[in-house]
Amino acid sequence: MSITPQEALQRTIEHREIFHDEMLHLMRLIMRGELSPVMAAAIITGLRVKKETIGEITAAATVMREFARHVEVQDNSNFVDIVGTGGDGSHTFNISTATMFVSAAAGAKVAKHGGRSVSSKSGSADVLEALGVNIDLQPEQVAASIAETGMGFMFAPNHHPAMKNIAPVRRELGVRTIFNILGPLTNPAGAPNQLMGVFHADLVGIQVRVMQRLGAKHVLVVYGMDGMDEVSLGAATQVGELRDGQIHEYEIHPEDFGMQMVSNRTLKVADANESKAMLLEALDNKPGVAREIVTLNAGTALYSANVASSIADGIQLAREAIASGKARAKVDELARFTQQFKQ
């Protein structure tokens, strides 16, 4: 079913849904650069004001996946993506990147999909470069990295070239749009399991249902109720879990896992170098909030990857991976492996 851009805009003004096939058509126009910047800006702003529906987000994610440069991974077992929407304004060190190293050391395969800074002063790409990792890899090189090291980083601009058509519009608008929530839904390696942090409580139920429609296996969508797009130590965390096609929504607390509730204020950083220093402190097993929050998030990721049978079991595996030095060794392993592809 086709819809004109003008009809779509009128729908958003009237707070009416754009149906699945119509949204597929619209998104393809956007990704091919066939909508004028004015019309593209009007539609994505209209969707934001109306509030995007699960159906609209699912259709948009389907099209972004169509246009992506895919990473072919042979073995999907224990394969997980660890990602946040960003935009939570917390300015913390890069917790999800530290979580990747711990999870890989404990037996998961991690396909991390990310870019430069959104909410932190240092995005996953920024801190990985500071750690000596070459992020500018071709899809087949990322696949080799996952096979060899258990980790692969997919720098979003390399895998979503069609996004260049909407990037100037997004930059000029300067407000959140549907594209802020599409990134975590469009992992180019198609990881069936995911730990996804979101920037608003309302997104927990929405994103987990979108992942259900997209055919994901085991997903935990999390929102720290102190505002973090991570599992938080400073408050309860709202969780939407998809497993075996079923969705369960619940809350978890640090105390559930024998951890103390502490403020996340000490996790704030000013730039990629500070983020790197705090990440390495955590992986070097230095006692403190950084190590604890990485352990908590890695435990959750290991549960999502089906390496662990529960979050508590995952936390135990994460502690062992850090204490043994295996997690810290993963940093150097990824840096060494990716540098061979440097142009």
Swiss-Prot record:
<feature type="binding site">
    <location>
        <position position="92"/>
    </location>
    <ligand>
        <name>5-phospho-alpha-D-ribose 1-diphosphate</name>
    </ligand>
</feature>
<dbReference type="InterPro" id="IPR035902">
    <property type="entry name" value="Nuc_phospho_transferase"/>
</dbReference>
<protein>
    <recommendedName>
        <fullName>Anthranilate phosphoribosyltransferase</fullName>
        <ecNumber>2.4.2.18</ecNumber>
    </recommendedName>
</protein>
<dbReference type="Pfam" id="PF02885">
    <property type="entry name" value="Glycos_trans_3N"/>
</dbReference>
<keyword id="KW-0460">Magnesium</keyword>
<feature type="binding site">
    <location>
        <position position="84"/>
    </location>
    <ligand>
        <name>anthranilate 1</name>
    </ligand>
</feature>
<keyword id="KW-0479">Metal-binding</keyword>
<comment type="pathway">
    <text>Amino-acid biosynthesis; L-tryptophan biosynthesis; L-tryptophan from chorismate: step 2/5.</text>
</comment>
<keyword id="KW-0057">Aromatic amino acid biosynthesis</keyword>
<dbReference type="GO" id="GO:0004048">
    <property type="term" value="F:anthranilate phosphoribosyltransferase activity"/>
</dbReference>
<dbReference type="InterPro" id="IPR005940">
    <property type="entry name" value="Anthranilate_Pribosyl_Tfrase"/>
</dbReference>
<keyword id="KW-0822">Tryptophan biosynthesis</keyword>
<comment type="subunit">
    <text>Homodimer.</text>
</comment>
<keyword id="KW-0328">Glycosyltransferase</keyword>
<feature type="binding site">
    <location>
        <position position="170"/>
    </location>
    <ligand>
        <name>anthranilate 2</name>
    </ligand>
</feature>
<dbReference type="Pfam" id="PF00591">
    <property type="entry name" value="Glycos_transf_3"/>
</dbReference>
<feature type="binding site">
    <location>
        <position position="230"/>
    </location>
    <ligand>
        <name>Mg(2+) 1</name>
    </ligand>
</feature>
<feature type="binding site">
    <location>
        <position position="229"/>
    </location>
    <ligand>
        <name>Mg(2+) 2</name>
    </ligand>
</feature>
<dbReference type="InterPro" id="IPR036320">
    <property type="entry name" value="Glycosyl_Trfase_fam3_N_dom_sf"/>
</dbReference>
<dbReference type="GO" id="GO:0005829">
    <property type="term" value="C:cytosol"/>
</dbReference>
<dbReference type="InterPro" id="IPR017459">
    <property type="entry name" value="Glycosyl_Trfase_fam3_N_dom"/>
</dbReference>
<feature type="binding site">
    <location>
        <position position="84"/>
    </location>
    <ligand>
        <name>5-phospho-alpha-D-ribose 1-diphosphate</name>
    </ligand>
</feature>
<feature type="binding site">
    <location>
        <position position="124"/>
    </location>
    <ligand>
        <name>5-phospho-alpha-D-ribose 1-diphosphate</name>
    </ligand>
</feature>
<feature type="binding site">
    <location>
        <position position="96"/>
    </location>
    <ligand>
        <name>Mg(2+) 1</name>
    </ligand>
</feature>
<keyword id="KW-0028">Amino-acid biosynthesis</keyword>
<keyword id="KW-0808">Transferase</keyword>
<comment type="function">
    <text>Catalyzes the transfer of the phosphoribosyl group of 5-phosphorylribose-1-pyrophosphate (PRPP) to anthranilate to yield N-(5'-phosphoribosyl)-anthranilate (PRA).</text>
</comment>
<feature type="binding site">
    <location>
        <begin position="94"/>
        <end position="97"/>
    </location>
    <ligand>
        <name>5-phospho-alpha-D-ribose 1-diphosphate</name>
    </ligand>
</feature>
<comment type="similarity">
    <text>Belongs to the anthranilate phosphoribosyltransferase family.</text>
</comment>
<dbReference type="InterPro" id="IPR000312">
    <property type="entry name" value="Glycosyl_Trfase_fam3"/>
</dbReference>
<feature type="binding site">
    <location>
        <begin position="112"/>
        <end position="120"/>
    </location>
    <ligand>
        <name>5-phospho-alpha-D-ribose 1-diphosphate</name>
    </ligand>
</feature>
<dbReference type="GO" id="GO:0000287">
    <property type="term" value="F:magnesium ion binding"/>
</dbReference>
<dbReference type="GO" id="GO:0000162">
    <property type="term" value="P:L-tryptophan biosynthetic process"/>
</dbReference>
<feature type="binding site">
    <location>
        <position position="230"/>
    </location>
    <ligand>
        <name>Mg(2+) 2</name>
    </ligand>
</feature>
<feature type="binding site">
    <location>
        <begin position="87"/>
        <end position="88"/>
    </location>
    <ligand>
        <name>5-phospho-alpha-D-ribose 1-diphosphate</name>
    </ligand>
</feature>
